[in-house]
């Protein structure tokens, strides 16, 4: 069972996943805007469709994982992402790590449009259908290339240059 909590630690969302078969279910009364997640102290957020994909990704890329934030949407709805970004205004870069299928691609396009403009958005496409498949089949993936494609959906806005004033351009006036 994967549990999502609010800021006070109260459980607000729960998702059950079977270990032997493909059973998955959200518990009745769960609020998807409070997802299973981990908040690091950095300004990067990695977004996944499900908790198992989030954990699989961390297993594949464990170095400094605690410094980043991770969020499982519980599908492809943007409710959880909207809440997270409204509470974590310091987020500067969002990595959309959704499945490598049509639904995942369409959701990335939609979610990217809803992310505030001052945040960079990058799509990481897994080398298999999802990140759990990548983890389970990592030995079959050549050169450990677990990310099939990196797509920049939005760059970070660049600061406007400050005009330079040269001393030769200044007119000296005696007072």
Label the model's feature ranges.
Residues 1-87:
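Phosphate-handling DNA/RNA-contact segment within nucleic-acid enzymes
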Residues 59-175:
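TOPRIM fold recognition
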């Amino acid at each position: 069972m994967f549990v999502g909590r609010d800021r006070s630690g109260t459980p607000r969302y729960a998702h059950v996943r079977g270990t032997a078969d493909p059973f998955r279910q959200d518990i009745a009364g769960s609020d998807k805007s409070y997802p299973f997640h981990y908040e690091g102290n950095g300004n990067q957020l990695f977004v996944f469709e499900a908790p198992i994909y989030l954990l699989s990704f961390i297993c594949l890329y464990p170095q400094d994982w605690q410094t980043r934030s991770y969020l499982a949407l519980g599908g492809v709805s943007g409710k959880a992402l909207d809440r997270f970004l409204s509470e974590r205004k310091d987020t500067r870069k969002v990595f959309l790590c959704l499945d490598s299928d049509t639904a995942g691609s369409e959701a990335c396009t939609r979610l990217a449009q809803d992310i505030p403009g001052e945040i960079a958005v990058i799509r990481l496409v897994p080398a298999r259908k999802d990140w759990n498949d990548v983890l389970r089949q990592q030995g079959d993936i050549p050169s450990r290339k677990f990310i099939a494609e990196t797509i920049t959906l939005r760059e970070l806005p660049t600061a406007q240059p400050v005009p330079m004033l040269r001393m030769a351009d200044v007119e000296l006036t005696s007072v």
